[in-house]
Design a protein with these regions (language model features):
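Bacterial Sec-dependent N-terminal signal peptides
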Residues: 1-46
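Sequence signature of WD/YWTD-type beta-propeller architectures
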Residues: 40-477
Length: 477
């Protein structure tokens, strides 16, 4: 029963988690050995011209990238002995690499991409196989005019499984290079699960996550102090699950869910995660109090996945008439609703509005995420339920909060599950999970929204050697 978790972060996480759990630190003495290796760059002679694009992994052909992204290294598919790649910028600059795969120098890459912001890069790819070179049609990447100033991404990595907590952790990955480090791993809390981590916007000074297990709790960090909340109490029905911070950092909204899972017996469907009931409430960080309302805790309906608007005066959430499981699992469909919130008084309004009626279209929505500039709200739409990670038909949609019109993000979506998502602080770039590679593992993709609400073709999070990384890792994001 695992959900994807990803967030942008505007700077490196502090060491407070490590200090909190009294992790032992060891001093390492590093010995830097610098080796000067003489390598021969082979001249590409008598290359056979192909009218086809190179088949590369990841598929970076025609993608749009931010000027600060890590090198977009790629592998050429097939039985290839060596690749030769020349990259030219439309505004000037050129770089050349040759090797087993396209492995771009970090400094050279950033220099070239930065100087071509708002322009494009043209890639000329040659591949050597059986002693012969083939030159493919050139392809392009576009360098966006929109900045992505975020320091990195935070995410959970977790191995396959349904019942047992194997090795997992919350991790931080820089976006301008390939550096990754653990924020916390469950080896530090043996036999337990860590999940549902959320920061206030992209600021790690305010941070919350859950520790699941016999002695579990919800850890809330705010103002340099940490508080451990009981996983359950008499005021709420189930465990505290999906959190979202108020932009002021004074409140954090939660759902409380009685979650279960069941296994399908039909082809291509594995697991269905559902709730027997769920409610929504807000926690006052300063007063250490729950803010409850009967409108968000109804008997016949399940309320779920709360998020605050950019100005903090509206709480969006999901609601569905609770069905009987397992017989009516395909009838559980959620609408997107909202209720006013007064941050000065810490109180809700007196009526609920339906923002997006998915049920009337025979669909359901999940994971609402407002952009930080207040312009859009992104959500995932699918056939039923709310746990989209297991739904191949799930797609990302964008609701324009000015016109209240919604549209699918066709250029970013795929034929497999496109699911959990979060915005960059600039409200143009967003990250989301997708199972488009193999239908089994969730991986991270990035895309950008322009002024008209149109997305760019999504690209897979760059890795040093992408083929090696994505084919040998057994972890989902």
């Amino acid at each position: 029963m695992k959900n994807e978790e990803i967030r942008f972060s505007d700077r490196r996480e502090s060491q407070w988690l490590r200090e909190l759990i009294n992790e032992k630190w060891f001093a390492y003495i590093g010995v830097l050995i610098v080796s000067f290796l003489v390598s021969c760059t082979e001249t590409v002679d008598n290359a056979v011209l192909s009218d086809k694009m190179p088949t590369i992994f990841p598929d970076y052909v025609g993608v749009t990238i931010p000027a600060t992204i890590a090198p977009m290294n790629f592998n050429v598919e097939g039985d290839v002995d060596k690749v030769d790649v020349v990259v030219k910028g439309s505004k000037g600059g050129e770089m050349h690499v040759q090797g087993e795969y396209a492995d771009f120098n970090l400094d050279d890459w950033h220099s070239l991409v930065a100087s071509n912001k708002g322009g494009k890069l043209t890639f000329t790819v040659c591949a050597k196989s059986d002693g012969r070179w083939t030159r493919y049609r050139d392809f392009e990447m576009y360098v966006s005019k929109y900045d992505m100033k975020d320091y990195g991404l935070t995410y959970r990595r977790i191995a396959p499984g349904y019942e047992v907590y194997s090795h997992m952790g919350l991790y931080e990955r820089r976006l301008d290079n390939f550096d990754e480090r653990a924020i916390i791993e469950n080896t530090q809390v043996p036999g337990m699960c860590v999940n549902c981590h959320t920061s206030c916007k992209t600021n790690p000074d305010n941070f919350v996550f859950h520790i699941r297990g016999d002695h579990g709790a919800t850890l809330v960090k705010s103002g340099g102090k940490c508080e451990l909340l009981k996983a359950k109490n008499d005021s709420i029905k189930g465990s505290m699950v999906y959190p979202y911070w108020h932009p002021s950092g004074k409140y954090c909204a939660f759902s409380t869910n009685m979650t279960r899972q069941g296994f399908h017996i039909v082809k291509d469907e594995r697991v269905e995660v559902f709730d027997l009931s769920s409610d929504v409430f807000v926690y006052d960080i300063e007063k250490h109090q729950l803010i409850l309302d009967t409108l968000l805790s109804t008997k016949l309906y399940s309320e779920n996945s709360p998020v605050f608007s950019a100005d903090g005066r509206t709480l969006y959430y999901l609601t569905s008439l609770q069905k009987e499981y397992p017989l009516q699992f395909k009838d559980q469909k959620y609408n997107l609703c909202s209720i006013a919130f007064d941050p000065e008084k810490g109180a809700f309004g007196n009526k609920v509005d339906t923002v997006y009626n998915a049920v009337s279209m025979g669909k359901t929505v999940t994971w609402p995420r407002p952009s930080y500039d207040g312009r859009y709200l992104m959500f995932t739409q699918m056939d039923y339920g709310y746990f989209s990670i297991w739904h191949k038909e799930s797609d990302l949609w964008l609701l324009d909060l000015r016109t209240m019109k919604a549209q699918p993000l066709k250029a970013a979506n795929s034929d497999d599950a496109d699911s959990f998502h979060n915005w960059s602080i600039g409200s143009h770039w967003f990250v989301f999970t997708s199972r488009r590679i193999d239908g089994l593992y969730s991986h991270l993709y990035l895309s950008c929204i322009d002024e008209k609400g149109q997305p760019t073709k999504a690209f897979l999070l760059p890795q040093k050697n992408p083929k090696e990384y994505y084919t040998t890792s057994i972890y989902s994001f």
